Design a protein with these regions (language model features):
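Membrane-anchoring hydrophobic helices of lipid-metabolizing enzymes
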Residues: 1-115, 151-153
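Soluble or luminal CAZymes and related metallo-dependent hydrolases
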Residues: 5, 39, 93, 164, ...
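Hydrophobic alpha-helical segments typical of transmembrane helices
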Residues: 9, 43, 124, 150-151, ...
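Active-site metal-coordination segments of metallo-dependent hydrolases
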Residues: 40, 141-145, 203-207
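Non-catalytic C-terminal accessory region of glycerolipid acyltransferases
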Residues: 53, 62-65, 103-106, 130, ...
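Short, flexible loop segments at the rims of nucleotide/cofactor-binding pockets, characterized by
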Residues: 88-93, 140, 157-163, 200-201, ...
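Catalytic core of membrane glycerolipid acyltransferases/transacylases, capturing the structured
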Residues: 107-166, 189-195
Length: 289
């Protein structure tokens, strides 16, 4: 209940302040959290392993500081989300490659989109929804039903439906059979069931869900990533489907095929994350050591 009340208060604050003031408050909050060192160790480790730089070097600290700011203004955008009309929303997110998703859906097997905790990834899924695609984004169940509905209703304002990760296998293939789209951040496994895969040259627990779902269902697996271009605007790209190695009846080792396809997915994530490290909002330790 306390968490829900906190979100409602922050929403009220976001509603009564113009964007420049809201972003200023977000910047102050980011500076405070950075000064307190909350999540700092994990963020430094993530950036260090992704770049090869020492965790305490000046450049890593600068990137971590920028991540805090990006995180806070993305939260501000989330709180103001109901105030942004669909036409304005489209203008704020410049998207390319929509035709790749349209063409993928011509197979009538749905589509699996993978992304990362990069930029305002929630808005990335919403941007596809306002284009007219039927999109489901994965989400976490929360202890407070009110808090859970708070997040869910905001997504629905732009047509994005929520698929809760602890219930997804019950519905996921039905969604794909209906030729709809599932969007999954693939750089973190909230269920803790992921196996180790090479990520930026290091062992990390990367979920194979997007790959395995695509392989089993026959749905195309497409990358889509979003990043902030300037203070108020974003760029989003939808790439062509990943050329997955198909599993056949005489496949000698299914796990080897999955691993090879995982390498393809991971390499795309690495490409976009490395280009926009200051927007990689990964607050979890995903590494084996």
């Amino acid at each position: 209940m306390i968490t829900f009340i906190g979100y409602k208060f922050l929403t009220f604050l976001a509603y009564i302040t113009p964007y420049p003031v809201t972003y200023f408050i977000a910047r102050v909050g980011a500076i405070l959290i950075y000064a307190l060192g909350i999540h700092a160790r994990v963020l430094k480790k993530n950036i260090s392993l992704a770049t090869g730089m020492e965790p305490e070097c000046r450049e890593v600290k600068k990137i971590v500081r920028d991540i805090y700011y990006q995180w806070f203004i993305n939260v501000a955008d989330f709180l103001k989300h109901p105030l942004v009309k669909a036409d304005k929303f489209k203008k704020r997110i410049e998207i390319t490659g929509v035709e790749n998703l349209s063409n993928a859906l011509k197979k009538n097997k749905g589509a699996v989109i993978f992304t990362a905790h990069l930029g305002n990834f929630e808005w990335g899924a919403c941007r596809l929804a306002v284009e007219g695609f039927k999109v489901w984004g994965t989400g976490l169940t929360r202890k407070s039903v009110k808090t859970m509905l708070f997040f869910e209703k905001r997504r629905l304002l732009k047509g994005l439906k929520t698929l809760y990760v602890n219930k997804m296998m019950l519905n996921i293939f039905r969604i794909l059979k209906n030729n709809e789209v599932i969007a999954i951040p693939a750089d973190f496994d909230p269920l803790g069931t992921a196996k180790l895969h090479k990520f930026f040259g290091h062992d990390a627990f990367i979920p194979s869900g997007p790959v395995e779902i695509a392989m089993k269902s026959g749905a195309p697996l497409l990358p889509s990533f979003i990043w902030r271009k300037d203070k108020y605007n974003h760029v989003q790209v939808v790439e062509e489907p990943v050329d997955l190695i198909a599993e056949t009846s005489d496949t000698p080792d299914r796990h080897e095929i999955i691993n090879l396809n995982m390498q393809k997915m991971v390499s795309v994530m690495e490409k976009y994350i490395s280009r926009h490290l200051e927007q990689w909002e990964m607050f979890h330790d995903i590494w084996s050591k």
